[in-house]
């Protein structure tokens, strides 16, 4: 961690927050060639006490529009490349007929957005994968085998490490009280 004696008076870009979102911003700014980037967080690096510190890290790739689906797939691949992702598949379960109709539409969206592996499961198929679910009370599920779980804090650290190597500076225990 940097000390106050090296704290810059100015920066071209300041990112507030060193969780997943802030570290991702810093990483992508560095990847795009941006220099003079500083990341500040009021908490310790990288378990800052914000959302990243207690996020479950579930990554479901199929979203309601193409851009969000592409972003989720990109994130999955990025975290996997850092070793911070565990592919275990993701199942969304329908307990109502309306939800089941929604999951059928979601599968169609996924296919049109490039998530070809998504599949609709019968109640029995859901129960065979998740024995805690009673097949008698559900309509079915939507399953994507390449969905999974990211270690959010490790992913933030991995992106920060790459950003640091590109010259981004990180300062923990640094609260932002005003912006000029």
Locations of the language-model features?
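A short, basic/flexible loop-to-alpha-helix module at the beginning of a structural domain
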Residues: 1-11
């Amino acid at each position: 961690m940097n000390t106050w004696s090296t704290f810059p008076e100015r920066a071209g870009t300041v990112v507030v927050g060193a969780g997943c979102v802030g570290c991702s911003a810093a990483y992508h700014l560095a990847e795009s060639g941006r220099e003079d980037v500083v990341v500040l967080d009021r908490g310790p690096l990288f378990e800052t006490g914000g959302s990243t510190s207690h996020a479950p890290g579930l990554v479901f790739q199929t979203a309601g529009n193409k851009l969000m689906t592409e972003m989720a797939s990109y994130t999955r691949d990025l975290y996997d490349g850092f070793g911070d992702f565990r592919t275990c598949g993701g199942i969304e379960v329908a307990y109502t007929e309306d939800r089941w109709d929604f999951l059928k539409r979601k599968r169609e969206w996924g296919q049109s957005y490039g998530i070809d592996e998504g599949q609709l499961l019968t109640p029995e198929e859901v129960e065979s994968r998740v024995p805690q679910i009673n097949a008698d009370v559900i309509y079915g599920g939507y399953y994507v085998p390449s969905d999974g779980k990211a270690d959010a804090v490790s992913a933030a650290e991995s992106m920060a490490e790459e950003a640091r190597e590109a010259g981004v500076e990180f300062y923990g225990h640094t609260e932002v009280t005003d912006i000029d």
